[in-house]
């Protein structure tokens, strides 16, 4: 009986700790409203630069825009990465 009770209490404690850790992780990953999107802006600028460079290189060779450079739901259009 003691073993079963100990096992149940241990399982409950682990479940509570796991749930608390998951909630803390989720809260830490949320963005606060009003905070600047500097990380996203940096990614967008990087994609724009990569796309422009790849398009300019291919333009000189009279080829179309290289769509492989823009990844993750983005495509290259008019020498810019645009969200699809």
From Swiss-Prot:
Pfam families: Toxin_20. Disulfide bonds join 51-65, 55-76, 70-81. Residues 1-22 form the signal peptide. Keywords: Disulfide bond, Neurotoxin, Postsynaptic neurotoxin, Secreted, Signal, Toxin. Residues 23-47 form a propeptide. It is found in: Secreted. GO terms for cellular component: extracellular region; host cell postsynaptic membrane. Expressed by the venom gland. PROSITE patterns: HWTX_2 (PS60022). SUPFAM superfamilies: omega toxin-like. It comes from the Eukaryota. One of its GO terms (molecular function) is toxin activity. Belongs to the neurotoxin 12 (Hwtx-2) family. 02 (Hwtx-2) subfamily. Postsynaptic neurotoxin. This is U4-theraphotoxin-Hhn1b. It comes from Cyriopagopus hainanus.
């Amino acid at each position: 009986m003691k073993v079963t009770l100990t096992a149940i209490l241990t399982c409950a404690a682990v479940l509570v700790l796991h749930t608390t850790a998951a909630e803390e992780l989720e809260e830490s990953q949320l963005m606060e409203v009003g905070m600047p999107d500097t990380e996203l802006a940096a990614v967008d600028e990087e994609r724009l630069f990569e796309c422009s460079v790849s398009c300019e290189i291919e333009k000189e060779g009279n080829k179309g825009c290289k769509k492989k450079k823009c990844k993750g739901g983005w495509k290259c259009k008019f020498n810019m990465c645009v969200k699809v």
